Curated annotation (Swiss-Prot):
Protein name (Swiss-Prot/TrEMBL): ATP-dependent DNA helicase PIF6
GO molecular function list: 5'-3' DNA helicase activity; ATP binding; ATP hydrolysis activity; DNA binding; magnesium ion binding
Domain of life (superkingdom): Eukaryota
The protein's assembly and partners: Monomer.
Binding site for ATP: 255-262
Organism ancestry: Eukaryota, Discoba, Euglenozoa, Kinetoplastea, Metakinetoplastina
Role of this protein: DNA-dependent ATPase and 5'-3' DNA helicase required for the maintenance of genome stability.
Keyword Ligase appears in the UniProt entry: no
Keyword field: ATP-binding, DNA damage, DNA recombination, DNA repair, DNA-binding, Helicase, Hydrolase, Isomerase, Nucleotide-binding, Nucleus
Matches recorded under InterPro entries: AAA+_ATPase (IPR003593), DNA_helicase_pif1-like_DEAD (IPR010285), P-loop_NTPase (IPR027417), PIF1_helicase (IPR051055)
CDD domains to which the protein is assigned, alphabetical: DEXSc_Pif1_like, SF1_C_RecD
Catalytic activity, EC: 5.6.2.3
Class of this enzyme: isomerase
One annotated Gene Ontology cellular component of this protein: nuclear lumen
Length: 796
C-alpha cells in the first residue's frame, strides 16, 4: 500500500499553488504543493511556497511587505489569491486546497491584517521537522520540536501530487495514469473488473476503503448541485468504475438523470486521482465545469470557438505556450457532459492532442480519457453559422436538415472507437429513489417508449393541480429562451408591489472585447420585486447548505450602510428559511487557471419559467410542463420531466404523447452496449400504447433501408449490428424513435485522420469555468481567445 507523503512543514497548507506573472506567463518553478507563512531573518514576513523538489530549508519566498492584494472571497471553498511582487515581477499566487481549508482561512485572515504579521512564527523554513511515514500512518497526535503537540493532522485524508514519484493507492493498484495497467485496457484485467462484485469503494485515503471520519463505506457529500438525498451508499457500478480508472483504462460513465454521476466524479477528483497538472477536469458546459472545479474542454484544448478549420485552429493552439504546456503535462483528462459535444469537436480535440504530444498513433496522444454523460438527454446543438462553416454544399438538403450520413454523436466517430473505452452504466436512481414506479416511467421516456406505465402516470400528472409550497409555484420548463423570458416578464408585472430594485453587475475583463454574457450565468441587469420567484445561481458564503438551483421568493429588501439594499429570499428547499443574498463574484479562468474576467452581481434569476437546457442537472421542488410539440428535439421531454423527485411534484398543463421520442442511433447504442438496462418484455406495463397520428418504427432503419429492395431489385443486406442478441431484444421492445438519421453508425475509419483531412470544428464552444450562461452574438476569436459560445443553445 502506498502511503501519502507527509507535510514538510506542519503548519503549511497543502494543495495546488500556481504562480502567474503580470503578463500572464505561468512561472512553474515558483509554484508548488504546500505553502506557509514565516518571518525569515533578513527578509521579514514571507509567504513560502514549496514543492517536492525543495529541501526542508528551501522554497520560493514571497516578501509580504510589498503585497498588493489578497483575494479571499472563496477562502471558504479552499481558494486564495495573493498579488505580490517577486524578483521585479508582479505575481499572482493562486492557492487551492481541499485538505487544509481551515488553515487557508487563517492564512487569509493573517495576510489581510498587517497588525498580525508580528505574530507570524520565525524562520519556519529553517526549522528541522522530521516526520516519518510511520508517524503519519499510526498516529494523529504528533509531537513537534517545541515539545507541544499538533492534533488532528490526518495526512492520509488527501493526496496531492507534488512530483514525478507521487502516486496514490486504490485497492493496491497505482492510480498514476501512466503507471497504471495500460496493457489491461483490452485484456483480462478490464474484463475481470467488470465482472467483479466489489464490496467497498476504493479511495486514496486507505487503499480501498473510506476512513471512518468520512462515513466508512458511505459518503455524505455536501455538494453544490447534489441530487442525492442524505447519505450515499456507493453501488457496485460506481466501485467498478473507480477500479477501472485506477488501472489506467479509458472509461465511459453513463446513466439516467439522478444516478449519482456527479457525486461519483467529485469523489474521484477529490480523493482518488492526483491533484496536480497531471489530472485535468473539464466539462462541455460552464455550469458543470464550475461545479467540478475545472474548466471547459474548449478552454483547456485552446480551440476557442474553433472557427476557420483545423489548420487555423491548430496554429492558434500552438501559439499559446500555456495551452501546449498543459497538454503535455496532462496524463488523465476528464470530460463531463460528453453528450453535448459534437463529433467534429471531439475528433478535433483528439487530433490536437496527438499532434501536440508527439504521439500521432495514440488516441489523445496517450492520455487516459474519462468520459461522463448521457446520450439520451439533450443532443449537441450547432449554431447555423457553425453548420454553414462546416458544410461544403453536400452535407445538407434544401431544408437545411442534416443528411442521413452526417454524424451526430461522439460514439459514432473513429476517435471513440480508437479509445477502446470500458463502458459502465450507473443504474440506481437516487433522485427518484422514493418513487420507483416513477423512475421506471422516466426510463421508458428516456428511451422514447410510450408505454402503459408512461400513459398512466402522465395522465395522473395532467389532472393534478399542485399548490405552492412556501410561496413557490411550480417552475414552468419550456424549450425556448424567448418563451421563458416573456413569461417571467409578464409574471413580474403582475406583482402587487410596484417598487422594484435594479442591480447592475460590476465587470472586469483582462481581454478587450470580452462578452461576459456568454461566460457567466450572472445577469448584467437584474430587476426584483417583493414576491418575485427566483432561483439561486451560486452558493452563498453564509449559507453553504444552499446551492445552485435552489428556489425561493423575495420577501423583503435589507438596507445596507453602503450600497443598495439586498434581497431577502425565503428558500423552499431549506424549509422556508429566509436568507440575505449578497453579491458574489464569478471568475472566468484561462486554460491554466489564470483569472481573465470577473463579474460581481446578485446570484439570482427570475424562475417562474426556465429553459430545459438551463434545467438540465437541476433538481427542482415543483415543476410544470407543457408537454406538446414545443419540445422539438429528442431528449427534451425526458430532461424536463426528470427534474423532480416524485410524480407528486410534477404537473402537466398540456399532454401530447408525440413529444416523447429519442434519437434512434442513441437508443441503438445503449441497447447494444447496456443490455442489462432493458426492462422485461413480460411486464404488461411495458407494453407500447399506439399514438394517434404518430408512426413508430418497430425496426428503426436508416434512410437507405426504407425501401424493401434496392435499385437492382435485391433485398437490402442486413447490417451486422442487427444480428446482435441485444439488438434483437430491442426490436421486440419497440420504441418511439426519431428516424430522421440512420440508426447504424458508419464503421470507423482505419486510417488515422490527417491534419489536412480533418474538417473545421463547429462553433459550439463553451464558457470556461463558469456556470452555464445564455448564448449571444459571438465575438472575434482574435479579440478574445478565451471567449466561447454556449453549446447548449436554447433558442431558435
Amino acid at each position: 500500500m502506498v502511503v501519502l507523503r507527509p507535510k514538510i512543514t506542519l503548519t503549511s497548507v497543502r494543495g495546488r499553488i500556481q504562480v502567474t506573472a503580470e503578463d500572464g506567463e505561468r512561472v512553474g518553478p515558483w509554484g508548488g504543493t504546500e505553502c506557509f507563512l514565516s518571518r525569515q531573518t533578513g527578509q521579514g514576513p514571507c509567504l513560502v511556497v514549496r514543492s517536492s523538489r525543495h529541501k526542508r530549508h528551501q522554497g520560493t519566498f514571497f516578501r509580504l511587505e510589498g503585497v498588493r492584494q489578497v483575494l479571499s472571497l472563496y477562502a471558504m471553498e479552499g481558494k486564495l489569491t495573493v498579488v505580490v511582487p517577486h524578483q521585479k515581477r508582479l505575481c499572482s499566487v493562486f492557492i487551492e486546497t481541499f485538505a487544509d481549508v481551515d488553515a487557508l482561512q487563517m492564512m487569509a485572515a493573517t495576510l489581510q491584517d498587517r497588525s498580525r504579521w508580528k505574530d507570524i512564527e520565525k524562520n519556519v523554513a529553517c526549522r528541522v521537522q522530521r516526520i516519518t511515514r510511520t508517524n503519519v500512518v499510526d498516529t494523529k497526535r504528533i509531537t513537534n520540536m517545541d515539545g507541544g503537540t499538533d492534533t488532528h493532522l490526518d495526512y492520509k485524508q488527501f493526496e496531492w501530487g507534488g512530483g514525478e514519484d507521487d502516486s496514490c493507492a486504490v485497492g493496491g493498484v497505482s492510480c498514476n495514469p501512466l503507471e497504471g495497467a495500460r496493457g489491461e485496457r483490452n485484456g483480462d484485467g478490464v474484463e475481470s473488473i467488470l465482472q467483479e462484485r466489489p464490496t467497498g469503494l476504493p479511495s486514496a485515503h486507505s487503499g480501498g476503503k473510506l476512513p471512518k471520519h468520512m462515513g466508512g463505506d458511505e459518503l455524505n457529500p455536501q455538494l453544490e448541485g447534489s441530487t442525492t438525498p442524505g447519505r450515499m451508499q456507493w453501488t457496485t457500478d460506481q466501485i467498478v468504475a473507480t477500479r477501472l480508472v485506477c488501472t489506467g483504462s479509458n472509461v465511459f460513465i453513463t446513466g439516467s438523470a439522478g444516478t449519482g454521476k456527479t457525486e461519483w466524479l467529485l469523489h474521484l477528483v477529490r480523493n482518488v486521482l492526483p491533484r496536480d497538472d497531471r489530472t485535468v477536469v473539464t466539462a462541455s458546459t460552464g455550469m458543470s465545469a464550475r461545479l467540478l472545479g475545472g474548466c471547459t474542454i474548449h478552454s483547456f484544448a485552446g480551440i476557442g470557438r474553433g472557427e476557420g478549420g483545423f489548420n487555423r485552429v491548430y496554429n492558434r493552439v500552438k501559439s499559446k505556450p500555456e495551452v501546449v504546456r498543459a497538454w503535455r503535462q496532462c496524463q488523465t483528462l476528464i470530460i463531463d457532459e460528453i453528450g453535448n459535444i459534437s463529433p467534429d469537436t471531439f475528433s478535433m480535440i483528439d487530433e490536437i492532442a496527438r499532434s501536440l504530444r508527439g504521439a500521432p498513433e495514440k488516441p489523445f496522444g496517450g492520455i487516459q480519457v474519462i468520459l461522463l454523460g448521457d446520450f439520451l438527454q439533450l443532443p449537441p446543438v450547432d449554431s447555423p453559422k457553425a453548420r454553414n462553416e462546416w458544410t461544403n454544399g453536400n452535407d445538407t438538403d434544401t431544408d437545411s436538415n442534416p443528411i442521413p450520413g452526417k454524424l451526430k454523436w461522439c460514439f459514432e466517430t473513429a476517435t471513440w472507437e480508437s479509445l477502446k473505452l470500458a463502458l459502465v452504466g450507473f443504474r440506481k436512481s437516487y433522485r427518484q429513489m422514493n418513487d420507483p414506479d416513477f423512475a421506471l416511467c422516466l426510463e421508458d421516456i428516456r428511451f422514447g417508449r410510450y408505454t402503459r406505465r408512461v400513459e398512466r402516470i402522465l395522465n395522473e400528472c395532467s389532472t393534478r393541480q399542485i399548490k405552492e409550497r412556501h410561496g413557490i409555484e411550480p417552475t414552468l420548463i419550456v424549450a425556448r429562451r424567448d418563451e421563458a423570458t416573456e413569461y417571467n416578464a409578464e409574471r413580474l408585472k403582475m406583482l402587487e408591489d410596484v417598487h422594484f430594485h435594479r442591480y447592475e453587475s460590476e465587470d472586469y475583463a483582462a481581454i478587450p472585447g470580452m462578452n461576459l454574457e456568454k461566460e457567466v450565468s450572472l445577469q448584467q441587469l437584474l430587476e426584483l420585486r417583493i414576491g418575485a420567484q427566483v432561483v439561486l445561481l451560486a452558493s452563498l458564503p453564509d449559507a453553504p447548505h444552499l446551492s445552485n438551483g435552489d428556489q425561493g421568493v423575495v420577501v423583503s429588501f435589507a438596507e445596507q450602510t453602503r450600497g443598495p439594499a439586498l434581497p431577502v429570499v425565503c428558500f423552499a428547499t431549506s424549509g422556508g428559511e429566509e436568507v440575505l443574498v449578497p453579491r458574489v463574484s464569478m471568475e472566468v479562468l484561462g486554460p491554466e487557471g489564470r483569472v481573465i474576467a470577473t463579474r460581481t452581481q446578485i446570484p439570482l434569476q427570475l424562475s417562474w419559467a426556465i429553459t430545459v437546457h438551463r434545467a438540465q442537472g437541476m433538481t427542482l421542488p415543483l415543476v410544470s410542463v407543457r408537454l406538446n410539440k414545443c419540445f422539438f428535439d429528442c431528449g427534451q421531454a425526458y430532461v424536463a420531466l426528470s427534474r423532480v423527485r416524485s410524480r407528486e411534484d410534477l404537473m402537466l398543463t398540456a399532454f401530447d404523447p408525440s413529444a416523447i421520442f429519442a434519437d434512434a442511433r442513441a437508443v441503438a447504442f445503449y441497447e447494444k452496449n447496456f443490455p442489462a438496462q432493458r426492462q422485461s418484455v413480460e411486464d404488461t406495463e411495458c407494453e407500447l400504447v399506439p399514438i394517434k397520428g404518430k408512426t413508430r418504427a418497430k425496426h428503426p432503419r436508416s434512410q437507405g433501408e426504407k425501401n424493401s429492395v434496392d435499385e437492382g431489385g435485391n433485398a437490402p443486406e442486413e447490417h451486422p449490428l442487427r444480428t446482435d442478441a441485444a439488438f434483437t431484444a430491442y426490436h421486440d421492445l419497440d420504441s418511439q424513435v426519431s428516424t430522421d438519421m440512420p440508426l447504424v453508425p458508419q464503421p470507423p475509419r482505419k486510417k488515422r485522420m490527417l491534419v489536412e483531412e480533418l474538417p473545421q470544428v463547429t462553433s459550439s464552444a463553451i464558457p470556461n469555468f463558469t456556470q452555464e450562461s445564455n448564448n449571444g452574438d459571438a465575438n472575434s476569436q482574435l479579440q478574445h481567445p478565451f471567449s466561447q459560445n454556449n453549446l447548449m443553445v436554447d433558442d431558435d
